Amino acid sequence: MRVLLKDGSVLEQGKWKQVDLAIENGVIVARGEQLFFPAEKVFDCRGFALFPGFVDVHVHLREPGFSYKETIATGSAACAHGGYTTVCAMPNLNPAPDSSEHLAVEEALIQGEAVIDVRPYASITMGQKGEGELTDMAALSGRVCGFSDDGRGV
């Protein structure tokens, strides 16, 4: 789909500037003033600031294990509504993402439910207890954004 955002405000080198953004299939393909871009949808963005997607490196999506508090579907939708396109989900889950098998449970939920890019953390310690045996960080590092025991000192 081709979309044109007209006269939005962008912050450029410390100054606000009015620009048009041409978007094709979700990708910005042109930026400038008074762009000619045949589009299926045109939005008048005067009075609105245009920003790239935001990133939040500390969110609680609560699945698996605590879906009565939040789910990946509801949490990621709320993040998208606020302009966040990428979030990093804390590991205070049940089971804690402390092994390949436990992380796979969370990854399957993310794959099936998230409406934005959700990157999981793995826990530092087994069971996210803040003490005792460490997780196999080398085995998990390629699948997570980092390691945390979220709220528990190690």
List where the protein language model places each region.
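Short, glycine/acidic-enriched loop or turn micro-motifs at the edges of active sites
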Residues: 27, 59-61, 152
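Histidine-rich, glycine-flanked metal-binding segment
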Residues: 1-53
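Histidine/acidic-residue-rich, glycine-tolerant segments that coordinate divalent metal ions
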Residues: 93-104, 109-154
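Short coil/turn connectors at secondary-structure junctions
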Residues: 1, 38-40, 46, 50, ...
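Redox-cofactor binding/interface segments in oxidoreductases and associated redox assembly factors
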Residues: 44, 89, 149
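Divalent metal-coordination and catalytic microenvironments
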Residues: 8, 26, 47, 58, ...
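Metal-associated gating/positioning segment near the N- to mid-region
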Residues: 48-113
